C-alpha cells in the first residue's frame, strides 16, 4: 500500500492539472488476502478516478476465497471505486474514457491478466 500511495502522490504532483485515473491490480498473495486488504484504506484518495483490478482465476489458482466488489470499496474507503475482475471489462472501460488531459496510471506487480497496455495505448491513441 505505501508504494502505491507514494507513486500516486508523485504522479499527482507531476500532473496537477490533469485528470488522474489510478488503476491498482491486486495480484500478490498478500494483496488478495481479505485480512490484508483494509491496509489499502485511503491509498487511492489522490486519484480523481480509482480502479481496482483483480482476476478471479488468480484467486482460484491461489485457492483463495472470492472478493466481493463492495468489500473492496469499503476496505479502500472509497464508495466511487470501480472494481473489475476481467481484463476485457477493464479494457473496454478505459477505451471509453475521455482522454483529454487525462493520465492513466497502471500499478501492479502482475500483468493485469495479460492486458497488453502498450498495444492498447497505441490502438487507442494514448
Regions found by a protein language model. Give the residues of each.
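ATP-dependent carboxylate-amine ligase
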Residues: 1-126
Amino acid at each position: 500500500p505505501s508504494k502505491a500511495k507514494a507513486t500516486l502522490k508523485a504522479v499527482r504532483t507531476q500532473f496537477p492539472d490533469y485528470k488522474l485515473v489510478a488503476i491498482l491490480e491486486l495480484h500478490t498473495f498478500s494483496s488478495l488476502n481479505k485480512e490484508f486488504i483494509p491496509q489499502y484504506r485511503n491509498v487511492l484518495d489522490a486519484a480523481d478516478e480509482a480502479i481496482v483490478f483483480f482476476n478471479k482465476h488468480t484467486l482460484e489458482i491461489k485457492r483463495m476465497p472470492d472478493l466481493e466488489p463492495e468489500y473492496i470499496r469499503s476496505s479502500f474507503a472509497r464508495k466511487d471505486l470501480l472494481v473489475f475482475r476481467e481484463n476485457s471489462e477493464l479494457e473496454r472501460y478505459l477505451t471509453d474514457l475521455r482522454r483529454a488531459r487525462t493520465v492513466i496510471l497502471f500499478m501492479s506487480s502482475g500483468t493485469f491478466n495479460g492486458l497488453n497496455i502498450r498495444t492498447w495505448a497505441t490502438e487507442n491513441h494514448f
